[in-house]
């Protein structure tokens, strides 16, 4: 079933301009956190425009929402409070009042829909994990007053602009490297008898910082739930620990067994609390929607190319890059769970697992890829990005022209990386309505 979108009405007017400015500011902030190559300086995102061509949407399937969408990490916005006092002033997780914002949006009942846009609070880390040096590579999308439930911006040493989880969720079910994030979901109903136990005591998985010298490397995930606490992290007041130490010192030839019960893989030695899951209700549902886009969305960036002749960083040439359009084809997931809408895209592997392999369509021509082909599995959801570059003082010669190509390649890689890390499952966005 196809869906028609009034693209002009949705992206124009004061609300559309405000949303475009928020997206521009978000992309700009992400570029400020990237380690730039030596020959590039001062990347600025100057404008963003939705264009005039709408995407093509086709509903492919309906199902129960993913288990991750039921995780309740918002202490001040519970389901019971939503039903009893829907007009309560929004507060953050520390109890501080935040400004609310309401706007009229088209498409709702009667042509108007009153809603608020926001994001979940960041996941809590256990105390021993806060000292491991692992920091999430997340940056807040600064929606300002448009999002009363925005992540609080937290300053992190060593990362400009601070970091935030930004409604970002890693696969927290302990999957192996050979499985896709949705492999377990495809094998059966996520709400089978064993699902709460599997998610109740599973270790947390977090994303670590990427290598600073590799612009296109993706952060890796590491299972920190089963990691034993270090020797220094044990408190000297622990009776079991003191008993074991005294026994070893008083009997050098004999090692006494400490009075610590044996641990099992199901009970790791950490203080990570189990996830609080919302109860599934009959009205909760999830839509799989095929999304195709080949429009004229535009994004403008400015930067400086440094020339190394006659000395390193001798002069900087201003450069303007214009992304004039892109081609996009993916499966979107939209879940509705009691005044919350969760949104994300599926990777090609996950889309094939849930939706089944698709044959190449004749209308796609040579750009349509078989889902099981190696090229499809390792390609980006952004099939094509069209770029136009303008450089000042072209009389500087080959040195400038050579680095223009490098800069274009660098910018396109970063745009793809930002999109995949922020919008592809297991990352997802939550909107409060």
Swiss-Prot record:
MF term (GO), any: lipid binding
Main location: mitochondrion
Compartments it resides in: Mitochondrion outer membrane; Endoplasmic reticulum membrane
Composition-biased stretches (Basic and acidic residues): 81-96, 268-279
Chain positions covered by the region annotation Disordered: 62-113, 180-279, 356-376
Membrane topology: Peripheral membrane protein
TM region(s), chain numbering: none
Pfam family, one: MMM1
Superkingdom of the organism of origin: Eukaryota
GO cellular component: endoplasmic reticulum membrane; ERMES complex
Keyword tRNA-binding: no
GO biological process: mitochondrial genome maintenance; mitochondrion-endoplasmic reticulum membrane tethering; phospholipid transport; protein insertion into mitochondrial outer membrane
Record key words, sorted: Endoplasmic reticulum, Lipid transport, Lipid-binding, Membrane, Mitochondrion, Mitochondrion outer membrane, Transport
Family annotation (CDD domains): SMP_Mdm12
Comp. bias regions, Polar residues: 214-236
Subunit comment: Component of the ER-mitochondria encounter structure (ERMES) or MDM complex, composed of MMM1, MDM10, MDM12 and MDM34. A MMM1 homodimer associates with one molecule of MDM12 on each side in a pairwise head-to-tail manner, and the SMP-LTD domains of MMM1 and MDM12 generate a continuous hydrophobic tunnel for phospholipid trafficking.
HAMAP family according to UniProt: Mdm12
Record note on domains: The SMP-LTD domain is a barrel-like domain that can bind various types of glycerophospholipids in its interior and mediate their transfer between two adjacent bilayers.
Function: Component of the ERMES/MDM complex, which serves as a molecular tether to connect the endoplasmic reticulum (ER) and mitochondria. Components of this complex are involved in the control of mitochondrial shape and protein biogenesis, and function in nonvesicular lipid trafficking between the ER and mitochondria. MDM12 is required for the interaction of the ER-resident membrane protein MMM1 and the outer mitochondrial membrane-resident beta-barrel protein MDM10.
Sequence similarity: Belongs to the MDM12 family.
Name listed for the protein in its UniProt record: Mitochondrial distribution and morphology protein 12
Upper classification of the organism: Eukaryota, Fungi, Dikarya, Ascomycota, Pezizomycotina
